[in-house]
Amino acid sequence: MTRLFGTDGVRGLANKKLTPILALRLGQAAAEVLTSDRESYERRPLAIIGRDPRVSGEMLDAAIASGLASRGVDVVRVGVLPTPAIAFLTDDFGADLGVMISASHNPMPDNGIKFFSAGGKKLPDEVEDRIQAAMDNLTEDGPTATKIGRIISEAPDGRERYLKHLAEVVTTDLSGIKVVVDTANGAASKVAPQAYEAAGAEVVAIHNKPNAFNINEDCGSTHIEKTQEAVVEHGADLGLAHDGDADRCLAVDAEGNVVDGDQIMAILAVGMKEENDLRFNTLVATVMSNLGLKLAMQEQGIDIKETAVGDRYVLEELNRGDFSLGGEQSGHVVLPDDCTTGDGTLTGLSIMARMAKSGKSLKELASVMTVLPQVLINVPVSDKAVILNAPEVKEAIAAAEAELGETGRVLLRPSGTEELFRVMVEAAEKEQARKVAGKLAAVVAAV
């Protein structure tokens, strides 16, 4: 049986792979699985649904809400809000489950559905498998009359609750900091500028006018050059770029240099260690993090725990070890004491708070880490499963590792959300990394 769930929920081309019928059935199955172990039966199960502003979101929102209600779940639809806001609100409302409809940084025609359990936590693989199994065994025998769930549309205070939460978490006065924020015409188009302004920062917002069709279009964290240009143009102290669902954040210093997720983690880790907030002096990162992060943390006396790629695996390790900071090079930064998932807006606030407390520029803070040259090539493939077992790929990897020696590394892995295979090479020199990565990518493409 083909697994329906990827590393970040169910994704696909909206109305083709991800249809309203599929969304309805997902809602029904999730209702059965996620409400079966409830401790309290004093009220009906409750679900929170949010979405990003892409055009298919309204259609899928209505479908999954109907599926949940048809299985006796009351539904609160909070409208367009970031993924971390839905995780927070699931907990804040005391809901039994949360649903976010978004394809994150993917192009507008795609969409996705991800679930949160009670407390706003991402689902483990085992629970997702139970939902898929429940879909295969759905019947028409649903509740009737008064046992059907109610649907409350566009709950008015969801955004206000989330903004209040952010203000309570980051209390540092950000007055005197000028920030450009690119919201990717996505889910944070309103809340991110509002949160930064509420903290005292002077905000220049760009790509913050979603029209259902322009999400991630030449903007946001996947087009960081737009933020770089705007920071220089407006003479800002920094820039922050989010993706479509605002669970990630990349930064730009005053000179227009990119500060990626690894550098952001290094900045926050050092600051948290100074304030005795970095539990066990440990940072959780993935195998894709730059070798420079490991070297910098060693210098600072900070340990690194490595995980597979994907913020869900970072979250699992954070929870397992009770650590207080983790993330990915892509800009997913997780502060588990304050949010159950990556939160781009909270990350932005935390970066600016570190600047305000230290009196240092972002460039000065980022200098704690030297980024080694890294080349990443995304290779479209038809069957991700066969790549790593192909003899020619194994031979190419061995040759690349021999060429790089101890001054670099090679990592090949399938994308969890797209039909791509990622080829990553780090080396002492950029040209060497580019050359080795190009050779490997050509071999992968030919399989």
Curated annotation (Swiss-Prot):
GO terms of molecular function: magnesium ion binding; phosphoglucosamine mutase activity; phosphomannomutase activity
Function: Catalyzes the conversion of glucosamine-6-phosphate to glucosamine-1-phosphate.
Record field: catalytic activity: alpha-D-glucosamine 1-phosphate = D-glucosamine 6-phosphate
Cofactor: Mg(2+)
One Pfam family hit: PGM_PMM_IV
Protein family according to the UniProt entry: Belongs to the phosphohexose mutase family.
GO biological process, one term: carbohydrate metabolic process
EC identifiers of the protein: 5.4.2.10
One Gene Ontology cellular component annotation held by this UniProt entry: cytosol
This protein's name: Phosphoglucosamine mutase
Record text on cofactor binding: Binds 1 Mg(2+) ion per subunit.
Keywords: Isomerase, Magnesium, Metal-binding, Phosphoprotein
PTM entry text: Activated by phosphorylation.
InterPro entries in the cross-refs: A-D-PHexomutase_a/b/a-I, A-D-PHexomutase_a/b/a-I/II/III, A-D-PHexomutase_a/b/a-II, A-D-PHexomutase_a/b/a-III, A-D-PHexomutase_C, A-D-PHexomutase_C_sf, A-D-PHexomutase_CS, Alpha-D-phosphohexomutase_SF
Residue numbers of Phosphoserine PTMs: S104
Residues the record marks as active site: S104
Enzyme class name: isomerase
Entry-linked SUPFAM superfamilies: Phosphoglucomutase, C-terminal domain (SSF55957), Phosphoglucomutase, first 3 domains (SSF53738)
Source organism (scientific name): Corynebacterium aurimucosum (strain ATCC 700975 / DSM 44827 / CIP 107346 / CN-1) (Corynebacterium nigricans)
Positions annotated to bind Mg(2+): S104, D243, D245, D247
